[in-house]
């Protein structure tokens, strides 16, 4: 009877391990606006070949406008400091800012995103320069940020993207 219990326990453990591995391939970020209230959510999924797919929906943003979207270096979203607590763009390679910069981009630089007429940003963005849990390029524990203006993809150090409107810690 004891060997049968051990086999049953081991088989349950074997089934549980792949599920745990799957959890490491995903993350979430709950966004907080300037007022400190939750205004959106992102689901992040690690791609098998590298990079991370970010699917997000954030409300309460300026309607009909392109806005900058970045990964920031620090996983702190403090509305009292206008989300300055999130630090600068995630940049493990010490590159220049911007996808149009000769020595860029930062790993956290991503294309501008469009906010619809309803003030909601809905997007799917792929960042090929990051992973969820890599030693140098991992973004779990860092922050996603939506800015008030579009990124010009060149200005140093942050693309003249303007005020930080919404921030979410990647967990």
Locate each region found by the language model.
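Bacterial N-terminal signal peptides
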Residues: 5-15
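N-terminal leader/targeting pre-sequences
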Residues: 17-171
């Amino acid at each position: 009877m004891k060997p049968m219990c051990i086999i049953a326990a081991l088989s349950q453990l074997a089934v549980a391990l792949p599920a745990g591995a799957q959890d490491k391939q995903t993350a979430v970020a709950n966004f907080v606006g300037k007022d400190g209230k939750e205004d959106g959510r992102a689901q992040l999924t690690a791609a098998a070949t590298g990079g991370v797919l970010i699917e997000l929906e954030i409300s309460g943003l300026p309607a009909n406008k392109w806005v900058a979207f970045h990964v920031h270096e620090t996983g702190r979203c403090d509305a009292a400091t206008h989300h300055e607590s999130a630090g600068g763009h995630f940049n493990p390679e010490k590159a220049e800012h911007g996808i149009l910069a000769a020595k860029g981009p930062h790993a956290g630089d991503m294309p501008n995103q469009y906010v619809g007429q309803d003030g909601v940003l809905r997007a799917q963005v792929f960042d090929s320069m990051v992973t969820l849990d890599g030693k140098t390029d991992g973004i779990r524990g860092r922050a996603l940020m939506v800015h008030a203006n579009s990124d010009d993809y060149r200005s140093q150090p942050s693309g003249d993207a303007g005020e930080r409107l919404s921030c979410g810690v990647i967990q």
